[in-house]
Amino acid sequence: MKSDMKNSWTGWFFMALILLSGCTNTPKQEAMYATTPHTNQRLPRNLPKKMFGIALQLPADFNSYKQGEHFLWLSNNDTEVVENIALYSIKENAISALNVPRFCHLRDSVMHKNVRGISDAIYMTTLQASVRGWKDNTTSTFWFEGLWEMQNDAMGGRFICRAIKRPSRHDILFAEAILYAPKTENKTILMRQLQTVLQSIK
């Protein structure tokens, strides 16, 4: 199964293709990210607030990032268990209903633009059949979880997304935890730890 690839080389390759040029400064990686905005600097802890008006409790090892238009990718840049948080916002008037098919369409459009491999033919996509969604009845929050994969490549994993309607900003903020841990048998604990990061958003 693509979501459970156990090849250590694949893990390194995923890092080289998808993660942040801020993790290393090699000319090869610079070329890989020529199509998307990127940075070689350490993560400013106030960047989520500056971009999206939010605060969240990130693990101490989240130091790498990639910044795009209304998009922020944060990572621990680990070599074995790659944990990522993606933040992006979409204007509310562009969303008529937030159900699973609509969410997958929106997610795929954002990831296709911001999370690519060495060529434009390699990009992150959502396995819609794996996705389930539910609403938190106490807040204006929707949750979605499922599997992601790299189109035209053998990499994948699990994700969970918190979608927050923000009437004051006339948008919906999407906060995702994205895991790539092919050598880890029980990924549930890792996903729940990442989910607490999403729940810390204020």
Where are these regions (language model features)?
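Short aromatic-glycine motifs in intrinsically disordered, low-complexity regions
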Residues: 42-55, 189
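Surface-exposed amphipathic alpha-helical segments
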Residues: 24-39, 56, 60-62, 171-202
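Oxidative protein folding and maturation machinery
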Residues: 1, 21-28, 60-61, 68-73, ...
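Secretory pathway targeting signatures of secreted, lumenal, and periplasmic proteins
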Residues: 59-116
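Signature of long, low-cysteine stretches enriched in small and polar/charged residues
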Residues: 21, 26-28, 112-169, 185, ...
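Terminus-proximal functional modules
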Residues: 21-40, 48-50, 69, 109, ...
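Bacterial Sec-dependent N-terminal signal peptides
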Residues: 1-28, 32
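Glycine-rich, often proline-containing surface loops adjacent to acidic residues and nearby aromatics
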Residues: 83-84, 140-143, 170-177
